[in-house]
Amino acid sequence: MKGIKKSLTEEYLYLDFSHQKEGCIFPLHTSVTLFLLSYCDCTVFKVFLVLPGESTGISLLKNVPSEGVEIQTISRQELPPIVQSCCLPAVVERPDNFCRAGLAVVLRHIIQKSYEADPSKKEILELLGFKKTCLKACAEVSQWTRLCELTVPLAVENFLKESFDQPPTIPAAILELEKKLSEPVRVHNDDKLRRQKLKQQKAAGVGPSLAKEKTKSKGHRQETSEEGDSSSASLELKVAFSKLTIHKEPASANREPSYVRKAKASDLPPLDHVFAEGLYFTLADIVLLPCIHHFLVIICRKLSGKLVEFPLVAAWYQRIQEVPRVQTAASQCGIQFISLPELQTTSSQQPPNLDEAPSAEEQNDPSFIGGPRPTMTKLMEKGIEVMFSPHPCPTWTLDWDTLPAAVSPKEGKMSSDRALRKQQQLNNLVYMVTNQAKPGDRIVDFCSGGGHVGIVLAHVLPSCQVILIENKELSLIRAKKRSDELGLSNIWFIQANMEYFTGMFNIGVALHACGVATDMVIEHCLKTRASFVTCPCCYGFIQNTSKVNFPKSELFKKTLSYKEHMILCRFADQTAVQLPPQRRLIGKQCMCLVDLDRARAAEEHGFSVQVISMEPESCSPKNNMIVGVPI
């Protein structure tokens, strides 16, 4: 392929392959990955289909995604050890110590490598969206990542397995996508585009009140015959498809009319979706297309009357076929697009509200009193008080002067004062880990960032395997560079969300894992029966998620409501050095109570747990450690 750089590192892409039915490759994560390879015309990876168990007799794919892609089959037992510890899809760089795992991470990497191989393909890089953040955040944080990576593929797979003996219901994930497509678009140049749309509507004779009425029904985007629709829809389409062409029209130098310039933001018409996330074709559309296609094939074949329940999804499916190269890529992957009947919605046919309704407790809790003191008093009445376990060795420290320079956090591009505090934090964690570690143990540094904890542990514990897990690619690359300088051979680097690490380990460690990430680390350790040493951070970001609920322990659940627990979390964040001493003291006490809840929850799972203050306490405003050992 033209423009390929000969110096590109050889990488191996591993995809699950269970079976292929009617052109649909299962699991759908594999279908999505192969579709992206075809769309990008990417040939820089050696692709392996990982067969279930020890299977070897499964026939190869009928539709190879690209002529230059080399595809082989492999059993799970033949996978490199680092890949065996991860969920697929996964990409590994030689010498098999740097792995990227999880659908979103792998797809973003394919896009970046395709662009590196041929920098003339700037439209490929545009798939990552504004500021290159499309599907970058983990599913726990981003609704779009959760929808594209988890809920839609899983929902469609389950739907395709149904026998339809009983009238089926449309999967909630599809209805959630329909709801998102009905929401106004938010883009970085939102105000400018909405003013352009106002100008278009005026030129078409559509008044503001009529325009607002029309936006209540998103089905009007589908080329209905009503006056002004084609004009109002043309702005979004023009902006969307201009991103997909090489030559863009120059911006107009004429000043906008006064009614456009002076219009209030509240009077501007909203922007409608052209593609999944808004106006621009992104990786989210690539992920959704194979899933929605196979879903619609079944719907049209057996349940065509159900199409009226998701007209915006159907319109998106037809619109996406107009994107350059989508037809070619789909054909190479065995996707034969189907024609859908024209659908319309009325203002009375709005997508259902799928937002979780607040619980009765959250809506009406007459006993709730704001502020930390009433909550702390309530706990004290139940015998729950601020209590720290003594530090087992407060004066212990690494001999930093004798360690190689690359081991020190000073190599991580930080000020000398901050580097000193980071060394003090590491002294605490390293002592706790080395006190428990045995030769041959696996130690996982979750949310590893630049690898400050993991690199020190790998250096001082050469007989242990250390695994760094981090979602941010640049942080992990910096950590690998430091590791290479030290010549460490007992360290792995995994770019993934922590739930995609499925390997066994003996000790889990996390320094300043943000918000619920600390709880996810502890949960991971509880399931694996591994010891843990965590230092929580960002208490103010703690909230209920799809996987974690607060309070966590039965003791705290019987005493505090969710709101009261959130009060503790909010005030636990108020420990900055510039705050008044009394306020910091209350913050420290709230930190302890939040962490005691975490500790008691772990004890309920058969662990011995302590909440300990780091020494010296000045090493960080967030200086609690939660140390747990399975009993």
From Swiss-Prot:
Tell me yes or no: is Phosphoprotein among this UniProt entry's keywords.
yes
> Where is this protein primarily located?
cytoplasm
Q: Where in the cell is it found?
A: Cytoplasm
Protein name according to UniProt: Glutathione S-transferase C-terminal domain-containing protein
Swiss-Prot/TrEMBL keywords: Cytoplasm, Phosphoprotein
The terms describing its cellular component in GO are: cytoplasm
Can you tell me which family this protein belongs to? Belongs to the GSTCD family.
**Domain called GST C-terminal: residue spans:** 128-330
Residues that the record marks as modified (Phosphoserine) are 231
Domain of life where this protein originates: Eukaryota
Q: Where is the composition biased (Basic and acidic residues)?
A: 211-224
Segments for region (Disordered):
188-233, 345-373
